[in-house]
């Protein structure tokens, strides 16, 4: 049976007590789960959540990281600091980082290479704006973001890389691509990966869907051939909405 990768991006939500409570509930709910799981809390919550998840089947993720190991980078958190609190994976290139904080493909690529250098798993987010989709450029945008985001990343590091497709127009809007539309873009992404790394490597890579996945639409999306998991935002903030997605195939 196909193993899915379901990740919860908590974004800028919760205090320490709330985060520990939710992590505890998710740990209990997923303890017998057969899929791959990750939780990405805010930086200030990482240590508390790490203490809850220790020894569990849930990876501890970060939502971003700085582009250098240390030094004069006010407000940034380095890969070494993330490792120090037990982080195992990091989300890079999220649409909010690209479009609100103006992170470029080149900057994201530097972070990807730095994370992989230190052994972190990476979820590289790609996706188009509404105007790009309406102009028929969705596939080209994703292709560019993948090629630039993975520049100088070797095939041997691909087992630590996941691609998350985020149609930007569906993030936090309640809108979502149809399963057929999402699968078509995922197929295009896999073709791009095949051109870069070969058919076998592309077939083995995980491509998550990250556009307002929720219990009501998760099964329809995850049953599609090229959709291998979900990067979950709002539905990842409550066990009653996250667990049905995380356990849908069981």
UniProtKB/Swiss-Prot annotation:
Subunit structure: Homodimer.
Pathway entry: Carbohydrate biosynthesis; gluconeogenesis; Carbohydrate degradation; glycolysis; D-glyceraldehyde 3-phosphate from glycerone phosphate: step 1/1
InterPro entries for the chain: Aldolase_TIM (IPR013785), TIM_sf (IPR035990), TrioseP_Isoase_bac/euk (IPR022896), Triosephosphate_isomerase (IPR000652), Triosephosphate_isomerase_AS (IPR020861)
Reactions listed under catalytic activity: D-glyceraldehyde 3-phosphate = dihydroxyacetone phosphate
Subcellular location: Cytoplasm
Originating organism: Treponema denticola (strain ATCC 35405 / DSM 14222 / CIP 103919 / JCM 8153 / KCTC 15104)
HAMAP family tied to this protein: TIM_B (MF_00147_B)
Its job: Involved in the gluconeogenesis. Catalyzes stereospecifically the conversion of dihydroxyacetone phosphate (DHAP) to D-glyceraldehyde-3-phosphate (G3P).
Binding-site list for substrate: 9-11, 172, 212, 233-234
Keywords noted in UniProt: Cytoplasm, Gluconeogenesis, Glycolysis, Isomerase
Segments crossing the lipid bilayer: none
Lineage, broadest ranks: Bacteria, Pseudomonadati, Spirochaetota, Spirochaetia, Spirochaetales
GO MF annotations, alphabetized: triose-phosphate isomerase activity
Entry annotation: catalytic residues: 94 (electrophile), 166 (proton acceptor)
GO CC terms of this entry: cytosol
Presence of the UniProt keyword Cytoplasm in the record: yes
EC number assigned by the record: 5.3.1.1
NCBIfam families: tim
Sequence similarity: Belongs to the triosephosphate isomerase family.
Leader sequence segment: none
GO biological process, alphabetically ordered: gluconeogenesis; glyceraldehyde-3-phosphate biosynthetic process; glycerol catabolic process; glycolytic process
Protein name, entry field: Triosephosphate isomerase
